[in-house]
Amino acid sequence: MSFIVYPAIDIRGGKCVRLFQGDYGQETVYADSPLAMAKRWVEQGASWVHLVDLDGAKEGKPANAAIIKEIARSIPVPVQVGGGIRTEEQIADYLEAGVARVIVGTAAIEDEPFTKRILQNDGDKIAIGLDCRNGLVATRGWLTTTDVQATELAKRLVTYGAETFIYTDIARDGTMTGPNVEEIAALAMATGKSVIASGGVSQLDDLLTLATHASDGVSGAIVGKALYTDAFTLEEALQRMEGRESYAG
């Protein structure tokens, strides 16, 4: 199975930013134009771009949708979008605007009838965002931690038609401490579905370690801070992934 590197663009107040461990009080602005940043990642070889509406995640409804739709229309690679998407109308709006995959987090945990419906209608275009703290799912922009075990929830959602999960380890997001490879691989094996890793990637070796679990279903990694702080470039990451595949093949 191929392994996709997703450069992340987190949007707050119309700008490209990064938060530390999801803390809205610890923000770094990296670019005034998310669209220019998306084009930059495409120029460097991105095959997908990962977009997050941080204002939307906090407010519970899309807040930077116009910018996100413009990016989806303007770049030649697919985009996946998360942040504040909690209704069928919002999902349809993004899909009609050219977004390839919509990430649903809070609503998937809090409203299972809704989740059942959207997975039955658009399962291949939906990713379930599992944002976790110590293996428990967090919701509402990471402000609330539930008592729901990520693996148990994921297995239940697979019965409704879930095909793709995005696993974020909140304690590692933006910290550059390395991803939680064990939990990510365990989730992929427990569900038999595609799991994209998010949070903590700090060096190329982290990507290579995750990619060794591609055959288990770990299908990619979302990378943010490591790219923005020049820990490595997207081009370097993609070259290493290609080298891994030709070596493995």
Swiss-Prot record:
Q: Where in or outside the cell is it found?
A: Cytoplasm
In alphabetical order, the GO MF annotations are: 1-(5-phosphoribosyl)-5-[(5-phosphoribosylamino)methylideneamino]imidazole-4-carboxamide isomerase activity
Task: State the top-level EC class.
Answer: isomerase
One Gene Ontology cellular component annotation held by this UniProt entry: cytoplasm
Keyword list (alphabetical) reads: Amino-acid biosynthesis, Cytoplasm, Histidine biosynthesis, Isomerase
Task: Report the CDD domains cross-referenced here.
Answer: HisA
Gene Ontology biological process: L-histidine biosynthetic process; L-tryptophan biosynthetic process
Q: Which Gene3D superfamilies match?
A: Aldolase class I
Q: Where is the active site?
A: 10, 131
Question: In the Enzyme Commission scheme, what number(s) does this protein have?
Answer: 5.3.1.16
**PANTHER family annotated for this entry?**
1-(5-PHOSPHORIBOSYL)-5-[(5-PHOSPHORIBOSYLAMINO)METHYLIDENEAMINO] IMIDAZOLE-4-CARBOXAMIDE ISOMERASE
Return the NCBIfam families for the record. Answer: 1-(5-phosphoribosyl)-5-[(5-phosphoribosylamino)methylideneamino]imidazole-4-carboxamide isomerase
Q: Which family does it belong to?
A: Belongs to the HisA/HisF family.
Q: What is this protein called?
A: 1-(5-phosphoribosyl)-5-[(5-phosphoribosylamino)methylideneamino] imidazole-4-carboxamide isomerase
- Lineage per the UniProt record: Bacteria, Bacillati, Bacillota, Bacilli, Bacillales
Whichever gene encodes this chain, its name is hisA
